[in-house]
UniProtKB/Swiss-Prot annotation:
InterPro entries from the UniProt entry: Capsid_hemagglutn, Hemagglutn_HA1_a/b_dom_sf, Hemagglutn_influenz_A/B
Name of this protein: Hemagglutinin
Membrane topology: Single-pass type I membrane protein
Gene Ontology cellular component terms for the protein in this record: host cell plasma membrane; membrane; viral envelope; virion membrane
Keywords per UniProt: Disulfide bond, Fusion of virus membrane with host endosomal membrane, Fusion of virus membrane with host membrane, Glycoprotein, Hemagglutinin, Host cell membrane, Host membrane, Host-virus interaction, Lipoprotein, Membrane, Palmitate, Signal, Transmembrane, Viral attachment to host cell, Viral envelope protein, Viral penetration into host cytoplasm, Virion, Virus entry into host cell
Glycosylated position list: N40, N74, N160, N179, N210, N246, N317, N346
Post-translational modification: In natural infection, inactive HA is matured into HA1 and HA2 outside the cell by one or more trypsin-like, arginine-specific endoprotease secreted by the bronchial epithelial cells. One identified protease that may be involved in this process is secreted in lungs by club cells.
Lineage: Viruses, Riboviria, Orthornavirae, Negarnaviricota, Polyploviricotina
Localization per record: Virion membrane; Host apical cell membrane
Family affiliation: Belongs to the influenza viruses hemagglutinin family.
Length: 360
Protein backbone atom coordinates (compact mmCIF):
# COMPACT_ATOMS: atom_id res chain seq x y z
CA UNK A 1 0.00 0.00 0.00
CA UNK A 2 2.85 2.33 0.82
CA UNK A 3 4.51 1.52 -2.51
CA UNK A 4 1.38 2.51 -4.42
CA UNK A 5 1.17 5.82 -2.65
CA UNK A 6 4.77 6.61 -3.43
CA UNK A 7 4.18 5.74 -7.06
CA UNK A 8 1.24 8.12 -7.32
CA UNK A 9 3.22 10.96 -5.85
CA UNK A 10 5.98 10.34 -8.29
CA UNK A 11 3.61 10.28 -11.23
CA UNK A 12 2.05 13.52 -10.09
CA UNK A 13 5.36 15.20 -9.57
CA UNK A 14 6.51 14.18 -13.01
CA UNK A 15 3.66 16.04 -14.76
CA UNK A 16 4.89 18.59 -17.33
CA UNK A 17 3.55 21.80 -15.59
CA UNK A 18 1.41 22.79 -12.61
CA UNK A 19 -0.58 26.17 -12.86
CA UNK A 20 -1.60 28.34 -9.93
CA UNK A 21 -3.96 31.37 -9.93
CA UNK A 22 -6.79 32.44 -12.23
CA UNK A 23 -6.15 33.62 -15.74
CA UNK A 24 -6.97 37.37 -16.07
CA UNK A 25 -5.96 40.44 -18.04
CA UNK A 26 -4.26 43.43 -16.42
CA UNK A 27 -6.68 45.54 -14.30
CA UNK A 28 -6.55 49.39 -14.19
CA UNK A 29 -9.15 49.54 -11.39
CA UNK A 30 -8.02 50.18 -7.84
CA UNK A 31 -10.46 50.47 -4.94
CA UNK A 32 -9.73 51.33 -1.34
CA UNK A 33 -11.35 48.93 1.09
CA UNK A 34 -11.97 49.18 4.81
CA UNK A 35 -10.07 45.97 5.66
CA UNK A 36 -7.46 45.45 2.93
CA UNK A 37 -6.47 48.96 1.83
CA UNK A 38 -6.03 49.44 -1.92
CA UNK A 39 -7.16 46.43 -3.94
CA UNK A 40 -7.11 45.80 -7.69
CA UNK A 41 -10.42 44.54 -9.05
CA UNK A 42 -11.57 43.42 -12.47
CA UNK A 43 -14.42 45.94 -12.75
CA UNK A 44 -15.94 49.02 -11.06
CA UNK A 45 -18.97 51.31 -11.38
CA UNK A 46 -18.15 55.03 -10.79
CA UNK A 47 -20.42 56.57 -8.12
CA UNK A 48 -19.17 60.18 -8.31
CA UNK A 49 -19.14 62.99 -10.81
CA UNK A 50 -17.33 66.33 -10.87
CA UNK A 51 -19.82 68.98 -12.04
CA UNK A 52 -19.08 71.93 -14.31
CA UNK A 53 -20.62 75.36 -13.83
CA UNK A 54 -23.98 75.85 -15.52
CA UNK A 55 -26.99 78.16 -15.53
CA UNK A 56 -29.36 78.05 -12.61
CA UNK A 57 -32.70 76.43 -13.35
CA UNK A 58 -36.14 75.67 -12.01
CA UNK A 59 -36.17 72.71 -9.65
CA UNK A 60 -37.98 69.84 -11.31
CA UNK A 61 -41.61 69.61 -10.25
CA UNK A 62 -41.75 73.10 -8.76
CA UNK A 63 -41.32 76.77 -9.58
CA UNK A 64 -38.14 78.57 -8.59
CA UNK A 65 -38.21 82.31 -7.89
CA UNK A 66 -35.48 84.51 -9.34
CA UNK A 67 -36.43 88.19 -9.22
CA UNK A 68 -39.13 88.95 -6.67
CA UNK A 69 -41.32 90.42 -9.39
CA UNK A 70 -40.33 89.07 -12.83
CA UNK A 71 -42.74 91.42 -14.62
CA UNK A 72 -41.52 94.58 -12.85
CA UNK A 73 -39.08 95.91 -15.43
CA UNK A 74 -36.07 98.04 -14.43
CA UNK A 75 -36.77 97.40 -10.74
CA UNK A 76 -34.39 96.03 -8.14
CA UNK A 77 -35.69 93.59 -5.55
CA UNK A 78 -35.53 96.36 -2.93
CA UNK A 79 -37.66 98.58 -5.19
CA UNK A 80 -40.25 95.80 -5.21
CA UNK A 81 -39.99 95.16 -1.47
CA UNK A 82 -40.61 98.86 -0.74
CA UNK A 83 -43.32 99.05 -3.43
CA UNK A 84 -41.75 101.89 -5.39
CA UNK A 85 -44.18 103.32 -7.95
CA UNK A 86 -43.95 101.37 -11.22
CA UNK A 87 -42.46 98.43 -9.29
CA UNK A 88 -45.66 96.97 -7.87
CA UNK A 89 -46.71 93.61 -9.25
CA UNK A 90 -47.45 89.99 -8.45
CA UNK A 91 -44.75 88.00 -6.68
CA UNK A 92 -45.08 84.37 -7.82
CA UNK A 93 -45.30 81.57 -5.27
CA UNK A 94 -42.21 79.39 -5.11
CA UNK A 95 -40.79 76.48 -3.12
CA UNK A 96 -37.24 77.60 -3.92
CA UNK A 97 -35.69 81.04 -4.47
CA UNK A 98 -32.43 82.37 -5.88
CA UNK A 99 -30.70 85.09 -3.86
CA UNK A 100 -29.16 86.95 -6.79
CA UNK A 101 -28.54 90.42 -5.30
CA UNK A 102 -25.84 90.22 -2.63
CA UNK A 103 -26.34 93.88 -1.62
CA UNK A 104 -29.88 94.84 -2.69
CA UNK A 105 -30.24 98.55 -3.44
CA UNK A 106 -32.99 100.88 -4.55
CA UNK A 107 -32.83 103.56 -7.19
CA UNK A 108 -34.58 106.50 -8.81
CA UNK A 109 -36.92 107.33 -5.95
CA UNK A 110 -35.32 108.68 -2.77
CA UNK A 111 -31.81 108.35 -1.29
CA UNK A 112 -31.84 105.72 1.45
CA UNK A 113 -29.24 105.44 4.19
CA UNK A 114 -29.00 101.69 3.73
CA UNK A 115 -26.43 100.98 6.37
CA UNK A 116 -28.32 102.56 9.27
CA UNK A 117 -30.77 99.65 9.41
CA UNK A 118 -31.32 96.06 8.28
CA UNK A 119 -33.33 97.21 5.24
CA UNK A 120 -31.03 95.37 2.82
CA UNK A 121 -32.32 92.16 4.37
CA UNK A 122 -35.95 92.88 3.46
CA UNK A 123 -35.91 91.37 -0.08
CA UNK A 124 -34.21 88.25 1.25
CA UNK A 125 -36.68 88.01 4.14
CA UNK A 126 -39.54 88.06 1.63
CA UNK A 127 -37.74 85.60 -0.61
CA UNK A 128 -37.74 83.08 2.24
CA UNK A 129 -41.55 82.82 2.11
CA UNK A 130 -43.42 80.62 -0.35
CA UNK A 131 -46.40 82.98 -0.72
CA UNK A 132 -46.07 86.78 -0.65
CA UNK A 133 -48.72 89.41 -1.32
CA UNK A 134 -49.09 93.13 -0.74
CA UNK A 135 -52.19 94.16 1.22
CA UNK A 136 -54.91 96.00 -0.65
CA UNK A 137 -55.62 98.33 2.30
CA UNK A 138 -53.43 100.68 4.29
CA UNK A 139 -52.64 99.60 7.82
CA UNK A 140 -53.27 103.08 9.32
CA UNK A 141 -54.78 106.42 8.24
CA UNK A 142 -51.56 108.41 7.95
CA UNK A 143 -53.20 111.80 7.37
CA UNK A 144 -54.96 111.60 10.75
CA UNK A 145 -52.20 109.94 12.76
CA UNK A 146 -51.20 111.48 16.13
CA UNK A 147 -49.45 114.82 15.64
CA UNK A 148 -51.43 115.59 12.47
CA UNK A 149 -53.22 116.48 10.37
CA UNK A 150 -50.60 115.63 7.80
CA UNK A 151 -50.21 116.03 4.09
CA UNK A 152 -48.45 113.14 2.40
CA UNK A 153 -45.12 114.07 0.87
CA UNK A 154 -44.08 112.92 -2.59
CA UNK A 155 -40.97 113.04 -4.74
CA UNK A 156 -40.59 113.94 -8.39
CA UNK A 157 -38.13 111.05 -8.64
CA UNK A 158 -40.99 108.61 -7.89
CA UNK A 159 -43.50 109.08 -10.72
CA UNK A 160 -46.45 106.73 -10.83
CA UNK A 161 -48.98 105.88 -13.52
CA UNK A 162 -51.25 108.84 -12.68
CA UNK A 163 -48.87 111.52 -11.41
CA UNK A 164 -45.41 112.91 -11.97
CA UNK A 165 -44.57 112.48 -8.31
CA UNK A 166 -45.25 109.77 -5.76
CA UNK A 167 -43.74 107.73 -2.96
CA UNK A 168 -43.33 104.13 -1.85
CA UNK A 169 -46.69 102.39 -1.39
CA UNK A 170 -45.49 100.80 1.85
CA UNK A 171 -44.97 104.17 3.58
CA UNK A 172 -46.57 107.61 3.93
CA UNK A 173 -44.31 110.64 4.32
CA UNK A 174 -46.11 112.56 7.08
CA UNK A 175 -45.52 116.32 6.70
CA UNK A 176 -47.51 118.55 9.13
CA UNK A 177 -50.12 120.70 7.37
CA UNK A 178 -50.27 123.60 9.80
CA UNK A 179 -48.76 122.68 13.15
CA UNK A 180 -45.10 122.91 12.13
CA UNK A 181 -43.71 122.77 15.64
CA UNK A 182 -41.54 120.47 17.69
CA UNK A 183 -43.40 117.61 19.33
CA UNK A 184 -42.88 115.21 22.17
CA UNK A 185 -42.73 111.53 21.16
CA UNK A 186 -46.05 110.33 19.71
CA UNK A 187 -47.29 106.75 19.54
CA UNK A 188 -49.29 104.98 16.84
CA UNK A 189 -50.46 101.37 17.04
CA UNK A 190 -50.02 99.23 13.95
CA UNK A 191 -52.80 96.61 13.78
CA UNK A 192 -52.53 93.18 12.20
CA UNK A 193 -54.55 93.27 8.96
CA UNK A 194 -53.47 90.13 7.06
CA UNK A 195 -56.42 87.78 6.62
CA UNK A 196 -54.94 84.28 6.22
CA UNK A 197 -52.83 83.87 9.33
CA UNK A 198 -49.68 85.05 7.54
CA UNK A 199 -46.73 86.91 8.96
CA UNK A 200 -47.21 90.65 8.48
CA UNK A 201 -44.10 92.55 7.40
CA UNK A 202 -44.63 96.25 8.15
CA UNK A 203 -42.28 98.80 6.56
CA UNK A 204 -41.72 102.20 8.18
CA UNK A 205 -38.98 104.82 8.51
CA UNK A 206 -38.17 108.51 8.84
CA UNK A 207 -36.91 111.43 6.78
CA UNK A 208 -34.21 113.88 7.80
CA UNK A 209 -32.54 116.80 6.04
CA UNK A 210 -30.32 119.79 6.69
CA UNK A 211 -31.36 122.28 9.38
CA UNK A 212 -33.02 124.71 6.97
CA UNK A 213 -35.18 122.06 5.33
CA UNK A 214 -36.07 120.45 8.67
CA UNK A 215 -37.27 123.84 9.94
CA UNK A 216 -39.29 124.50 6.78
CA UNK A 217 -40.90 121.06 6.66
CA UNK A 218 -41.41 120.25 10.32
CA UNK A 219 -40.75 123.37 12.38
CA UNK A 220 -37.93 121.61 14.25
CA UNK A 221 -34.29 121.37 13.15
CA UNK A 222 -33.11 119.15 16.00
CA UNK A 223 -32.43 115.41 15.76
CA UNK A 224 -35.64 113.39 16.12
CA UNK A 225 -36.19 110.12 18.01
CA UNK A 226 -37.96 107.01 16.71
CA UNK A 227 -38.75 103.57 18.14
CA UNK A 228 -40.49 100.50 16.73
CA UNK A 229 -41.65 97.46 18.66
CA UNK A 230 -43.19 94.18 17.46
CA UNK A 231 -42.91 90.49 18.25
CA UNK A 232 -40.64 91.21 21.21
CA UNK A 233 -38.13 93.22 19.14
CA UNK A 234 -37.61 96.92 19.92
CA UNK A 235 -35.42 99.22 17.81
CA UNK A 236 -34.36 102.82 18.55
CA UNK A 237 -33.13 105.54 16.18
CA UNK A 238 -32.03 109.17 16.34
CA UNK A 239 -32.09 111.09 13.06
CA UNK A 240 -29.01 112.71 11.57
CA UNK A 241 -29.25 116.39 10.58
CA UNK A 242 -27.21 117.18 7.47
CA UNK A 243 -23.71 115.93 6.70
CA UNK A 244 -25.02 112.93 4.76
CA UNK A 245 -22.73 110.62 2.80
CA UNK A 246 -22.97 110.53 -0.99
CA UNK A 247 -25.57 108.06 -2.22
CA UNK A 248 -23.70 106.54 -5.14
CA UNK A 249 -25.86 103.40 -4.96
CA UNK A 250 -28.96 105.45 -5.71
CA UNK A 251 -27.59 106.96 -8.89
CA UNK A 252 -26.95 110.50 -7.65
CA UNK A 253 -30.55 111.43 -6.82
CA UNK A 254 -31.04 115.21 -6.40
CA UNK A 255 -32.71 115.32 -2.97
CA UNK A 256 -30.81 117.06 -0.19
CA UNK A 257 -32.37 114.84 2.48
CA UNK A 258 -32.17 111.15 3.26
CA UNK A 259 -34.56 108.51 4.51
CA UNK A 260 -33.91 105.66 6.90
CA UNK A 261 -36.15 102.63 6.31
CA UNK A 262 -36.75 99.63 8.55
CA UNK A 263 -39.37 96.91 8.97
CA UNK A 264 -40.95 94.84 11.71
CA UNK A 265 -42.49 91.38 11.57
CA UNK A 266 -45.90 90.99 13.21
CA UNK A 267 -47.19 87.52 13.97
CA UNK A 268 -50.90 86.70 13.49
CA UNK A 269 -53.11 88.87 15.67
CA UNK A 270 -50.21 90.84 17.19
CA UNK A 271 -50.13 94.64 17.26
CA UNK A 272 -46.96 96.64 16.70
CA UNK A 273 -46.16 100.18 17.87
CA UNK A 274 -44.15 103.07 16.46
CA UNK A 275 -43.07 106.00 18.63
CA UNK A 276 -42.01 109.01 16.56
CA UNK A 277 -41.34 112.70 16.22
CA UNK A 278 -41.17 114.82 13.09
CA UNK A 279 -40.31 113.32 9.73
CA UNK A 280 -41.87 109.92 10.29
CA UNK A 281 -42.64 107.61 7.35
CA UNK A 282 -45.77 105.88 8.60
CA UNK A 283 -46.59 102.34 7.44
CA UNK A 284 -49.22 101.92 4.74
CA UNK A 285 -49.55 98.74 2.68
CA UNK A 286 -48.00 95.69 4.37
CA UNK A 287 -46.65 92.38 3.15
CA UNK A 288 -48.58 89.24 4.07
CA UNK A 289 -46.33 86.19 3.77
CA UNK A 290 -46.69 82.47 4.51
CA UNK A 291 -45.01 79.12 3.90
CA UNK A 292 -41.30 78.54 3.47
CA UNK A 293 -39.19 78.84 0.35
CA UNK A 294 -35.67 77.40 0.39
CA UNK A 295 -33.13 80.08 -0.54
CA UNK A 296 -29.78 79.63 -2.24
CA UNK A 297 -27.27 82.17 -3.52
CA UNK A 298 -27.07 82.17 -7.29
CA UNK A 299 -27.45 84.17 -10.46
CA UNK A 300 -29.99 84.85 -13.17
CA UNK A 301 -31.39 83.87 -15.62
CA UNK A 302 -33.17 80.61 -14.82
CA UNK A 303 -32.90 78.23 -17.78
CA UNK A 304 -34.64 74.86 -18.03
CA UNK A 305 -35.08 72.41 -15.16
CA UNK A 306 -32.66 70.59 -12.88
CA UNK A 307 -32.75 68.04 -10.06
CA UNK A 308 -30.61 70.23 -7.83
CA UNK A 309 -29.52 73.86 -7.42
CA UNK A 310 -25.92 74.26 -6.23
CA UNK A 311 -24.48 77.60 -5.08
CA UNK A 312 -21.24 77.05 -7.05
CA UNK A 313 -22.31 74.97 -10.04
CA UNK A 314 -25.87 76.15 -10.76
CA UNK A 315 -28.39 73.62 -12.00
CA UNK A 316 -27.32 69.96 -11.64
CA UNK A 317 -28.96 66.76 -12.79
CA UNK A 318 -28.32 63.80 -10.49
CA UNK A 319 -26.47 61.39 -12.76
CA UNK A 320 -24.47 59.90 -9.86
CA UNK A 321 -25.26 59.64 -6.13
CA UNK A 322 -22.07 61.53 -5.10
CA UNK A 323 -19.99 64.43 -6.40
CA UNK A 324 -16.51 65.86 -5.88
CA UNK A 325 -15.28 69.41 -6.39
CA UNK A 326 -16.38 72.55 -4.55
CA UNK A 327 -18.57 71.97 -1.52
CA UNK A 328 -21.40 74.52 -1.13
CA UNK A 329 -25.05 74.82 -0.18
CA UNK A 330 -27.42 72.92 -2.45
CA UNK A 331 -31.18 72.37 -2.53
CA UNK A 332 -33.35 69.79 -4.26
CA UNK A 333 -32.60 66.17 -5.16
CA UNK A 334 -28.83 66.60 -4.91
CA UNK A 335 -25.85 64.25 -5.00
CA UNK A 336 -23.84 64.02 -1.77
CA UNK A 337 -20.46 65.74 -1.64
CA UNK A 338 -17.40 63.56 -0.97
CA UNK A 339 -13.70 64.45 -0.87
CA UNK A 340 -12.52 61.69 -3.20
CA UNK A 341 -14.24 59.65 -5.92
CA UNK A 342 -16.17 56.56 -4.85
CA UNK A 343 -16.35 53.35 -6.88
CA UNK A 344 -18.50 50.25 -6.54
CA UNK A 345 -16.60 47.04 -7.32
CA UNK A 346 -18.74 44.86 -9.59
CA UNK A 347 -16.02 42.32 -10.47
CA UNK A 348 -13.70 39.96 -8.64
CA UNK A 349 -10.47 40.70 -6.90
CA UNK A 350 -7.78 40.88 -9.54
CA UNK A 351 -5.16 38.12 -9.56
CA UNK A 352 -2.06 38.31 -11.75
CA UNK A 353 -1.65 35.89 -14.69
CA UNK A 354 -0.79 32.29 -13.82
CA UNK A 355 2.86 31.60 -13.05
CA UNK A 356 4.74 28.54 -14.29
CA UNK A 357 6.34 26.29 -11.70
CA UNK A 358 9.76 24.90 -12.36
CA UNK A 359 9.87 21.43 -13.81
CA UNK A 360 11.14 18.81 -11.48
Amino acid sequence: MKAIIVLLMVVTSNADRICTGITSSNSPHVVKTATQGEVNVTGVIPLTTTPTKSHFANLKGTKTRGKLCPNCLNCTDLDVALARPMCIGTIPSAKASILHEVRPVTSRCFPIMHDRTKIRQLPNLLRGYENIRLSTHNVINAERAPGGPYRLGTSGSCPNVTSRSGFFATMAWAVPRDNKTATNPLTVEVPYICTKGEDQITVWGFHSDNKTQMKNLYGDSNPQKFTSSANGVTTHYVSQIGGFPNQTEDGGLPQSGRIVVDYMVQKPGKTGTIVYQRGVLLPQKVWCASGRSKVIKGSLPLIGEADCLHAKYGGLNKSKPYYTGEHAKAIGNCPIWVKTPLKLANGTKYRPPAKLLKER
